[in-house]
Amino acid sequence: MAWPKVQPEVNIGVVGHVDHGKTTLVQAITGIWTSKHSEELKRGMTIKLGYAETNIGVCESCKKPEAYVTEPSCKSCGSDDEPKFLRRISFIDAPGHEVLMATMLSGAALMDGAILVVAANEPFPQPQTREHFVALGIIGVKNLIIVQNKVDVVSKEEALSQYRQIKQFTKGTWAENVPIIPVSALHKINIDSLIEGIEEYIKTPYRDLSQKPVMLVIRSFDVNKPGTQFNELKGGVIGGSIIQGLFKVDQEIKVLPGLRVEKQGKVSYEPIFTKISSIRFGDEEFKEAKPGGLVAIGTYLDPSLTKADNLLGSIITLADAEVPVLWNIRIKYNLLERVVGAKEMLKVDPIRAKETLMLSVGSSTTLGIVTSVKKDEIEVELRRPVAVWSNNIRTVISRQIAGRWRMIGWGLVEI
């Protein structure tokens, strides 16, 4: 009997400094190399959000952690009994390079839990290790596992010394008691212990499917090959993660903020209306989709609207749902004490009127000018509007420091 075909039910972010082995770790668990983009293969680093999913099961004849498997057979004991299916999970592989922080933040909005990857053969913490750690805390991703990777290239003493540094780093923070699991992703050593950790510490959250459905868009594309006959063209495809509610094939939907329209020098956005033609997770088609995993929604849209990630940062909801699209937003904010991500730990200066900030709201990243500053509240006029699907959505606030956008705080968007 084969395992059931189900959609993934939890999104796990894989974050950390560039070259610490995030993509190799995802491959060790799932068998999938997530860097598929030609530029990524050439440069050997993740640029877009990578993605992979896998099943998790448990062999009832084996002891844990060896009992955990990702396919319907057990290599540990060779038992004829099929391991019991537990759930399907998905991994979002975030880029670790500092210039791609906005991409990491758009991915963090989709994460139910995270794995912070630390290379055992480098000083700890590296700038983006610290930056990603702070970002997870800000966005509220509290189910964390720290993976000490590349333990095969250091001595036991060096690995233990770094383990103590990690414990010291998390002491007194929200992550004080998170598990630290040593692995070698390259040699697939201790991956079963990591899967056990995922089952224990990153549970599937409760999903209220009666809420109005909302999907955050992180990709959109044209699946037609050049030269396709007009009558064989397929509509645009939109990829992302559902954060609440349930979508079904044939539902009428809208994309917000929508299409940029310029009339007499004034820019506005108009919602894009369409219908769901198909729902896919990986290679499997489904009739409906709920939160968990990255979903590809097929539509009847002109593919020129969706090509080359054109709709990145949008949201999808039902055609008749009321969702405000705002050019001016009010944020109840908190500043960090120090700027994270830079080599030197600079003090965060107060926000000033008329300065330009970068705001990450859901999967959208937009720039805005501060129009008013009060004690714990700012008003910002945006260059590109954002769709705000509920009150108190978390936003990450970044400021340009020495030519790079750096996280300086977070806030709740009030509507």
From Swiss-Prot:
Region G5, residue ranges: 184-186
Q: Where is this region: G3?
A: 93-96
Give this protein's Gene Ontology molecular function annotations.
Answer: GTP binding; GTPase activity; metal ion binding; translation elongation factor activity; translation initiation factor activity; tRNA binding
Q: Which Pfam families match?
A: eIF2_C, GTP_EFTU
The protein's Enzyme Commission number:
3.6.5.3
Similarity comment text for this entry = Belongs to the TRAFAC class translation factor GTPase superfamily. Classic translation factor GTPase family. EIF2G subfamily.
Q: What is this protein called?
A: Translation initiation factor 2 subunit gamma
User: What gene is behind this protein?
Assistant: eif2g
